[in-house]
Amino acid sequence: LLATLIIAHVVLAVWFAAITPYRTKGYELAINPETRQQIEMGDIGAPDELQHSNYVRNLMRTGQFPVLNPKDPDLYQNYQSHQPPLYYVLAAGWSKLTMTNPDLGSQQDGFKLRFLNIIFGALTVLSTYRLARAVKASESTALLAAMIPALLPMNLALSGAMSNDPLLFALTAWCLVMVAKGVTDGWDTRTAITAGILAGLAALTKTTAISIFAALFFAAAAGFVFKREGKRMGPLIAIGVGLAIAAPWWIRNLGVYGDPFAMNAFTASFGGTTQAADMQESVGVPQYWVKLVGLFVARSFIGTFGYMNIWLSSTGGLDGKMQVYDISLLVLVIGAVAGLFKIRTNSAASIVLGLYTLTIFVLFVRFNMQYFQAQARYLYPALAPISVLIAAGWSSIDRNKKGFAVLALSIALLLPMGMAFKNVPAGFEQRLQPMSKP
């Protein structure tokens, strides 16, 4: 069954990779009120994919890592240049392995490059299963957990696109597997070093991966709180290994940007991004968090496509009517709430994973206090523990194993996937040509 879920993820992600436009200009389905012209878009495909592919292309052409310059006249093309290097090095190598045109300009080139992330997506499915088993969940619960990253439309779309997100999800999930194993069974040298390597590689994938070190810190604290000998030094060793792996890149950033995470250059470059303060002034603080951030992050957890402008339904529930999103979210929330009641509060591994997930949510809220970026993919570094929580909840509801849990999660995941088959290709097609004038 696990192999079936992995194969299903690969097949569905390939479909997203095939139907999503690559490096393609188009039009938003809206009119600029000032110019009375339809809004043009530099890219209509996957979020930031144009810029990620530019990073890979420049790396292949020059053999050097790019530098983010806030005054770059082509900043729109290059605003991902501050990102850590691991994904782009792997993508450049993958490009050569698959004999992709170095220009990376055609849809076929994009499809080849996207397939690398499909592999990473499959690894995330496997790691979610392993995480559930590491916290002593049953085989059936572990398979339920793996269903979520395997079939969740938004995760499938990310696996079928070019970015550093799927590699980040895979590395953080596998690091959490090691953390759960160490906290539950004891930290041997191999587990500690493996966790450290995974944390370091995650930090070399995306700056937000710094949160994985919080999981290691919580694991170290758990060893003292629960007074378990042999479970204290392992996380500290892992932290040391991870920091040693990431340190060269951070030192390089100190020389280039003046800070290890290139935050100064990032802040200067993203000044034109929609500011939270402006949105709050426009609609009010409560409405901002509930109707904008809350609504958009809830819907995009299931799936919103293109540049957050292609919904699974015609309105995305913005008209207040019951939509496919509400059904899916209801099933997932019921599972999560039931999971909170099932998980033992004295389980060290559960507490560590819960604190890590809370850290991801806090960082997300902090980010949206400055920028309006209500995209649930920023929560996906915690997708594996969230999936385990939901699966544990539905397993407790269906304790007699009558199939209710499988049925509920199948509805929550396959119903929106069916809507994606219907609406996503049409949504991209609409944006390829300008709207006809009346």
Q: Which residue ranges define each predicted feature?
A:
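Transmembrane alpha-helix segments characteristic
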Residues: 143-144, 344-366
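Membrane-interface alpha helices of multi-pass inner-membrane proteins
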Residues: 191-207, 213, 241-244
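Start-transfer (signal-anchor) and selected internal transmembrane alpha helices
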Residues: 1-36, 125, 224-225, 233-241, ...
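Transmembrane-helix signature of polytopic, membrane-embedded enzymes
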Residues: 101-107, 128-151, 169-170
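Membrane-interface transmembrane helices that cradle and orient dolichyl/undecaprenyl
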Residues: 135-136, 175-194, 202, 224
